[in-house]
Regions:
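Short, well-ordered beta-to-alpha junction loops that form the rim of enzyme active sites
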Residues: 108-110, 131, 181, 200-204
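Loop-to-helix element that buttresses phosphate recognition and phosphoryl-transfer chemistry
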Residues: 65-116, 169-182
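Bacterial N-terminal signal peptides
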Residues: 33-43
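Phosphate-coordination/substrate-recognition cap region in phosphate-metabolizing enzymes
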Residues: 53-55, 91-156
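Short glycine/proline- and acidic residue-enriched helix-loop micro-motifs
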Residues: 155-176
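Acidic, low-complexity terminal tails and accessory targeting/binding regions
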Residues: 48-56, 135-147, 190, 195, ...
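Bacterial N-terminal signal peptides that target proteins for export
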Residues: 5, 11-13, 19-34
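Generic beta-sheet signal
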Residues: 58, 188, 195-203
Length: 252
C-alpha cells in the first residue's frame, strides 16, 4: 500500500480564515482537508523525501478507535482500551508505514495510545511518555456528549473546555495542558535532529503538538479534527518553515 502526499495543509495568517476546504475527489475522501490559519511556504516533493540529512520527519497519528469513541463518551485521562475496529486501524497504520525507516516510536502511557503503537512498531524502540497523554478533563471524564442522554454535559463541556484557564473541576486547563505537551515535544525533538519518528497520541494532544510546532493560536489549534485513522506528516529542517501534510493511500 503506497502512501501519497495530499495537497499541503495550507496555513494562513488571518484567524478569520479558519475553515475546512473540500479537496478534489481524486485526492481526498469525503473528509475535508483542514485549512489552518498561519502562512507557511510549503515547498516539498514526495521524491525528495530523505534527501536532506538534516530533515526530521514526524509522522503524527491518533490512537485507534475505542468503544468510548463510538459512544461519544469523554475519555480524557481514563485508560480505555482499543476495540476491534481500533486494532484493525492500528494494523492498517502499520501497513501504511511499511517501508518507512523509523528511528523511534512514541506513545502516551494510556493503553489506547500505547497499544496502537505496539501494533505498529515491530522491532522499533517504543517510548511511552506521560507528557503525551490526553488532557485530563476532571468531572467530565466518562460522561457522554449526547443532548438526549446528558443535556447538561452537552451544553457545559464544549464551552468550558475551550476556556484556556478552566481546570474543569479537577482536570487540567488548556494552558496547563499545552505547557505539558510543548515541553514533551521539545524533549522529543531534542532527541532527534534528523530522521523519521512516529508519535501516536490523542485528539487534543495532537492539537497541542501542532500548536507548538506551527505556533498556532489556541482557537486555531482546537479547530483541528483528526480522525482515529488519519495520519499527518510534519517535516522540520533548519532554516525553513515547518511543513504539514495529511497522508493518504490509493484506497482513499
Amino acid at each position: 500500500m503506497d502512501l501519497h502526499l495530499s495537497r499541503p495543509i495550507v496555513l494562513r495568517t488571518n484567524p478569520g480564515l479558519i475553515s475546512r476546504r473540500r479537496a478534489r475527489r481524486h485526492l481526498i475522501p469525503e473528509r475535508c482537508l483542514l485549512c489552518l490559519s498561519i502562512f507557511l511556504v510549503l515547498v516539498a516533493n514526495h521524491r525528495a523525501w530523505g534527501q536532506s540529512s538534516q530533515t526530521l520527519r514526524i509522522y503524527l497519528a491518533r490512537h485507534g478507535e475505542t468503544d468510548w469513541n463510538v459512544e461519544r463518551r469523554l475519555q480524557g485521562g481514563i485508560d480505555t482500551a482499543l476495540n476491534s475496529t481500533g486494532r484493525k486501524q492500528a494494523a492498517k497504520l502499520a501497513e501504511r508505514l511499511k517501508g518507512i525507516r523509523l528511528d523511534a516510536v512514541y506513545s502516551s502511557t494510556l493503553s489506547r495510545s500505547r497499544d496502537t503503537a505496539e501494533i505498529v512498531r515491530g522491532d522499533i524502540p517504543l517510548k511511552s511518555l506521560a507528557g503525551l497523554s490526553e488532557r485530563r478533563i476532571g468531572k467530565f471524564e466518562g460522561k457522554k456528549l449526547d443532548r438526549t442522554i446528558d443535556p447538561a454535559t452537552a451544553l457545559e463541556y464544549p464551552k468550558r473546555s475551550r476556556d484556556p484557564d478552566d481546570e474543569l473541576d479537577g482536570g487540567e486547563s488548556l494552558n496547563q495542558f499545552y505547557e505539558r505537551v510543548r515541553t514533551t515535544i521539545e524533549f522529543i525533538r531534542s532527541q532527534h535532529s534528523s530522521g523519521a519518528i512516529l508519535i501516536v497520541a490523542h485528539a487534543i494532544t495532537n492539537q497541542m503538538i501542532l500548536r507548538a510546532i506551527f505556533n498556532l493560536t489556541l482557537p486555531q489549534a482546537i479547530s483541528i479534527r483528526q480522525a482515529n485513522d488519519e495520519l499527518y506528516l510534519i517535516e522540520l529542517d533548519a532554516g525553513n518553515a515547518p511543513r504539514l501534510w495529511k497522508l493518504i493511500t490509493e484506497a482513499n
